[in-house]
């Protein structure tokens, strides 16, 4: 019963991440810019003194912040997909990780296509590549966590 609940929770995390991505992609260009500007300003306010946060700096960092947001949210998706597929296709990493990558890339493509319907926005191959890289890194982080967890578990069982 516990495993079934964890499996459902794992897929729920995937679904919630996908919904979050969908909602961000549904924003028109102006709203999307405001959202990322708010986050960017919060980060800059936290990391730099007020006198160093100039309008030029804020403007200069707009593009990198937006791309890091793309990368980060798709990294989360890759991690969640890996967890869900790992629990669904137990002990078959050679199936679960490629499935995670394929699903993540397909979602990145569909996300860019979806942006085509949001006013002032459009799809770019660059964003698909950034999103796909995020998925791949998310899967890699998950694999690393599993490796570390299994190593610790094995050491405890030896003692």
Model regions: which residues?
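Membrane-interfacial alpha-helical segments at the cytosolic side of multi-pass membrane proteins
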Residues: 73-88, 133-149
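Membrane-interface loop-to-helix entry segments
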Residues: 63-77, 125-136
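Hydrophobic alpha-helical transmembrane segments
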Residues: 11, 97-102, 128-129
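Interfacial helix-loop-helix junctions of multi-pass membrane proteins
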Residues: 108-132
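Membrane-interfacial, low-structure loops and terminal tails that flank and connect transmembrane helices
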Residues: 153-159
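"…centered on the first transmembrane helix and the immediately adjacent amphipathic helix/loop
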Residues: 2-75
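Membrane-helix interface segments
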Residues: 3-8, 90-98, 121-125
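Small-polar-interrupted transmembrane alpha-helices in polytopic inner-membrane proteins
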Residues: 16-21, 96-116
């Amino acid at each position: 019963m516990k495993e079934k609940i964890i499996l459902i929770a794992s897929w729920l995390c995937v679904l919630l991440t996908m919904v979050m991505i969908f909602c961000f992609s549904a924003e028109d260009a102006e709203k999307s810019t405001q959202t990322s500007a708010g986050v960017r300003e919060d980060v800059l306010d936290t990391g730099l003194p007020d006198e160093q946060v100039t309008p030029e700096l804020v403007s200069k960092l707009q593009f990198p912040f937006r791309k890091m947001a793309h990368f980060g949210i798709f990294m989360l998706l890759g991690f969640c997909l890996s967890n869900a597929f790992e629990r669904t296709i137990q002990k078959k990493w050679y199936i679960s990780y490629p499935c995670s990558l394929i699903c993540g890339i397909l979602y990145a493509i569909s996300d860019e296509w979806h942006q085509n319907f949001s006013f002032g926005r459009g799809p770019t191959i660059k964003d698909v590549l950034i999103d796909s890289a995020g998925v791949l890194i998310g899967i890699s982080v998950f694999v690393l966590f599993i490796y570390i967890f299994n190593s610790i578990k094995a050491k405890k069982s030896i003692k």
